[in-house]
UniProtKB/Swiss-Prot annotation:
UniProt-annotated site: Interaction with coactivator FXXLF and FXXFY motifs, residues: E874
Modified residues (Phosphoserine): S65, S81, S248, S627
Free-text comment about domains: Composed of three domains: a modulating N-terminal domain, a DNA-binding domain and a C-terminal ligand-binding domain. In the presence of bound steroid the ligand-binding domain interacts with the N-terminal modulating domain, and thereby activates AR transcription factor activity. Agonist binding is required for dimerization and binding to target DNA. The transcription factor activity of the complex formed by ligand-activated AR and DNA is modulated by interactions with coactivator and corepressor proteins.
UniProt source species: Sus scrofa (Pig)
Sequence segments annotated as region (Interaction with ZNF318): 1-563
Alphabetized Gene3D superfamilies for the sequence: Erythroid Transcription Factor GATA-1, subunit A (3.30.50.10), Retinoid X Receptor (1.10.565.10)
Any one biological process term the GO annotation gives: regulation of protein localization to plasma membrane
UniProt name for this protein: Androgen receptor
Region (Interaction with CCAR1): 568-895
Gene: AR
Localisation per UniProt entry: Nucleus; Cytoplasm
Residues found modified as Phosphotyrosine: Y215, Y259, Y299, Y338, Y349, Y354, Y355, Y385, Y511, Y528, Y892
Covalent crosslink: Glycyl lysine isopeptide (Lys-Gly) (interchain with G-Cter in SUMO): K378, K497
UniProt cross-references to Pfam families, sorted A to Z: Androgen_recep (PF02166), Hormone_recep (PF00104), zf-C4 (PF00105)
UniProt region (Interaction with LPXN), positions on chain: 528-895
Length: 896
């Protein structure tokens, strides 16, 4: 026989109540009660007529042993009325049940043979309609049974409606007996000090004081220790106890029981304590009774999904009323979150779509049933995707979702003529996984004849026959014929994404509005996607306005004016990555000034605004005048603008974000060896790669690209960028006599031979000498380096090829503007542009040779003891083979 270990002592369990596991105890007992209700329910006893109850009581008293009769003592209630404390047939103390008001019994029933006389408080109890609970016939002697949860009735009234089997499970051995002596002392002190009426009545009648009286002190309240135990029992059973803390016992907080019976309603709608198990499980998933409608509306899809399989089941319960009647309350399966009746007037937000889930609903959601006036269960309304679906569709990547909302625009699948022609286009995904783009965001009401209509980006939609194919997408080899490109011919893909992801961050420079083309159709106003900024772009403090070309606060405005106009050079004491916020903006002036430049601040912003106004004014005067001085006036205006643009904001940003000097960590005291030199080069490459990523993310317009395109462009162009930057350092530091990889790693002729890459080093030194021969200026170097980032792409194209092409062309225009800044002769500008573009083309063959060298070195690195950092090894092993196999090719300006 198995035994249960309680807090008090070891006591035997009935054989039928032996379980293994806490949750198995709970659900198996509940299942047994549902299947075999038995006569243990208090309703079964209360529904019997008074005569039958009297006969049953007489029979029970005759069969009760003398020792058992001594244990069944009468206990006065708070108002002095006697109550009988009985034990259930399983040998455990039962919970005190709430006595139903009865009009059929006017006096306390007492068997004439027992010789009991009614106490003085009995008459008052009878007048109030209270009745005694008859004792249940015992199965065995249970004098050692614990009196645990029978003491918790006044504090946890919700448990009073639970079944007897559930009470048996909750009645563990001697849980409250540890505190019984302390409570008895407290009760004695309270009895002496207070001298309540119930105590005087017991002393007058000489009635013995029951164990419950001695524990509770004749009142319905319990100590803090008992409350803590009550909370522990409730938490172990998955019950919400938050509501018990702020409500007094007199408020009768019903419905917080595990099965949530609606005891606050009229008797006709009160369910039985034995609610279905599905409702019990559903209630355990909720957060508790203290949640508001607005908070729980966010998680309604998840709760509705859990109870989806229970939609066909009725979760209502029936019970007997006061006069033996019964009623049924039907509740939907999603009604599992409790709330008080005071919160019923709080409006939920059924149309709010927090997670932008594109759920396709077959029809409008059914209206929820009206809540019961006394019900304490929150009615969860399904998500309403009617009028609010337009806002959700506008945030999706694919424009065709905008036609799904109920705003009056027909779309595919809505019964319009376009439903047939667009049936092969899924609303969320393309027909084939290999397609690069999704459905373009045109109007929802097109027909089959409008398949070639112009999309927002100028792309055309293919006819129905090509809907599931690549459309008229050009062959990748035709994009860059012969590896030469002047202006990339745009293909006409079947569809294009309308990317509006978080990577498309706004930039206040000249390319900040690049993504806001006037041809793009927005479902909602542009302010919906880009809310007006109200914080300083430098420190995050409250912005006072647009100062020097950026939205900043007054402090950063004054700092930039003084720092930009002053002659003082700021140096960062750290690694040029200090945190600049409201509280630490004064710690590092160097990083603060760099962040100002990154935000687009410049001293000429005010002058540019004045010149722009002057230009508009002069153009207006020139258009209205008919004098022969019209042409000279226009030339004068252009000359003023071009003269100012010799120092554009673009160059200020490039100068501010240029990475600093990176050391390789090479030990020059050790003798040079192949493994040591190459390991130091690999370590330097990984360190520089981190700076390249930060530099690229700060470039104007770079984040307008798709996030996958950003990663691809950096992984393909990192070698060319490092070679180009190393050539510039060699030119400026050692006059191109040696290769200046890092201050602690400079390659001379000996190291070039020792590294076994002499031919590659010679070509890199020749590139460095080109900077001196062509007299490259720092402004030209910065722009060429930025353009080199956008000079190699996959043959199949990027995910957002149009943005990439526009960004590359804008950088080419910036380079041409820098060239034309100091040259007035167009022929000289063209010659200079030719020289610089030829220099850019010469970087690609060098980078390809280095790609081949590093890939071969990685394969045999374990043989030559050369260390490869993890990030470098991953890029070389994954991305470099694509370049060597021809899947990724550079973009040349001239024929090779």
């Amino acid at each position: 026989m198995e035994v249960q270990l309680g807090l008090g002592r070891v006591y035997p369990r009935p054989p039928s109540k032996t379980f293994r596991g806490a949750f198995q105890n709970l659900f198996q007992s509940v299942r047994e009660v549902i299947q075999n209700p038995g006569p243990r329910h208090p309703e079964a006893a209360s529904a019997a007529p008074p005569g039958a109850r009297l006969q049953q009581q007489q029979l029970q008293q005759q069969e009760t042993s003398p020792r058992r009769q001594q244990q069944q003592q009468q206990q006065p209630s708070e108002d002095g009325s006697p109550q009988v404390q009985s034990r259930g047939p399983t040998g455990y103390l039962a919970l005190d049940e709430k006595q139903q008001p009865s009009q059929q019994q006017s006096a306390p029933e007492c068997h004439p043979e027992s010789g009991c006389t009614p106490e003085p408080g009995a008459a008052s109890a009878a007048s109030k309609g209270l009745q005694q609970q008859p004792p249940a016939p015992p199965d065995e002697d249970d004098s050692a049974a614990p009196s645990t949860l029978s003491l918790l009735g006044p504090t946890f009234p919700g448990l009073s409606s639970c079944s007897t089997d559930l009470k048996d499970i909750l009645s563990e051995a001697g849980t409250m007996q540890l505190l019984q002596q302390q409570q008895q002392q407290q009760q004695q002190q309270e009895a002496v000090s207070e001298g309540n009426s119930s105590g005087r009545a017991r002393e007058a009648t000489g009635a013995p004081i029951s164990s419950k009286d001695s524990y509770l002190g004749g009142s319905s309240t319990i100590s803090d220790s008992a409350k803590e135990l009550c909370k522990a029992v409730s938490v172990s059973m998955g019950l919400g106890v938050e509501a018990l803390e702020h409500l007094s016992p007199g408020e009768q907080l019903r419905g917080d029981c595990m099965y949530a019976p609606l005891l606050t309603g009229p008797p006709s709608v009160r369910p039985t304590p034995c609610a279905p198990l599905a409702e019990c499980k559903g209630s355990l998933l909720d957060d508790g009774p203290g949640k508001s409608n607005e908070e729980t509306a966010e998680y309604s899809p998840f709760k509705a999904g859990y109870t989806k399989g229970l939609d066909s089941e009725s979760l209502g319960c029936s019970s007997g009323g006061e006069a033996g009647g019964s009623g049924t309350l039907e509740l939907p399966s999603a009604l599992s979150l409790y709330k008080s009746g005071a919160l019923d007037d709080v409006a939920a937000y059924p149309s709010r779509d927090y997670y932008n889930f594109p759920l396709a609903l077959a029809g409008p959601p059914p209206p929820p049933p009206p809540p019961h006036p006394h019900a304490r269960i929150k009615l969860e309304n399904p998500l309403d995707y009617g009028s609010a679906w337009a806002a959700a569709a506008a945030q999706c990547r694919y424009g065709d979702l905008a036609s799904l909302h109920g705003g009056g625009a027909p779309g595919p699948g809505s019964g319009s003529p376009s439903a047939t022609s667009s049936s092969s286009w899924h609303t969320l995904f393309t027909a084939e996984e290999s397609q690069l783009y999704g459905p373009c965001g045109g109007g929802g009401g097109g027909s089959a004849g409008e398949a070639g209509a112009v999309a927002p980006y100028g792309y055309t939609r293919p006819p129905q026959g090509l809907a599931g194919q690549e459309g008229d997408l050009a062959i990748p080899d035709i994009w860059y014929p012969g590896g030469v490109v002047s202006r990339v011919p745009y293909p006409s893909p079947s569809c294009v994404k309308s990317e509006m992801g978080p990577w498309m961050e706004s930039y206040s420079g000249p390319y900040g509005d690049m993504r806001l083309e006037p041809t793009r159709d927005h479902v909602l106003p542009i302010d919906y996607y880009f809310p007006p900024q109200k914080t300083c772009l430098i420190c995050g403090d409250e912005a006072s306005g647009c100062h020097y070309g950026a939205l900043t606060c007054g402090s950063c405005k004054v700092f930039f004016k003084r720092a930009a106009e002053g002659k003082q050079k700021y140096l960062c004491a750290s690694r040029n990555d200090c945190t600049i916020d409201k509280f630490r903006r004064k710690n590092c002036p160097s990083c603060r000034l760099r962040k100002c430049y990154e935000a687009g601040m410049t001293l000429g912003a005010r002058k540019l605004k004045k010149l722009g106004n002057l230009k508009l004014q002069e153009e207006g005067e020139a258009s209205s005048a008919t004098s022969p001085t019209e042409e000279p006036a226009q030339k004068l205006t252009v000359s003023h603008i071009e003269g100012y643009e010799c120092q554009p904001i673009f160059l200020n940003v490039l100068e501010a974000i240029e990475p600093g000097v990176v050391c390789a960590g090479h030990d020059n005291n050790q003798p040079d060896s192949f493994a040591a030199l190459l390991s130091s080069l690999n370590e330097l490459g990984e360190r520089q790669l981190v700076h390249v990523v930060k530099w690229a993310k700060a470039l104007p317009g770079f984040r307008n690209l798709h996030v996958d395109d950003q990663m691809a462009v950096i992984q393909y162009s990192w070698m060319g960028l490092m070679v180009f930057a190393m050539g510039w350092r060699s030119f400026t530091n050692v006059n191109s006599r040696m290769l200046y990889f890092a201050p602690d790693l400079v390659f001379n002729e000996y190291r070039m031979h020792k590294s076994r890459m002499y031919s590659q080093c010679v070509r890199m030194r020749h590139l460095s000498q080109e900077f001196g021969w062509l007299q490259i200026t720092p402004q030209e170097f910065l722009c060429m380096k930025a353009l080199l980032l956008f000079s190699i792409i996959p043959v199949d194209g990027l995910k957002n090829q149009k943005f990439f092409d526009e960004l590359r062309m804008n950088y080419i225009k910036e380079l041409d503007r820098i060239i034309a800044c100091k040259r007035k002769n167009p022929t000289s500008c063209s010659r200079r542009f030719y020289q610089l573009t030829k220099l850019l083309d010469s970087v690609q063959p060098i980078a390809r040779e280095l790609h081949q060298f590093t890939f071969d070195l990685l394969i045999k690195s374990h043989m030559v003891s050369v260390d490869f950092p993890e990030m470098m090894a991953e890029i070389i092993s994954v991305q470099v083979p694509k370049i060597l196999s021809g899947k990724v090719k550079p973009i040349y300006f001239h024929t090779q």
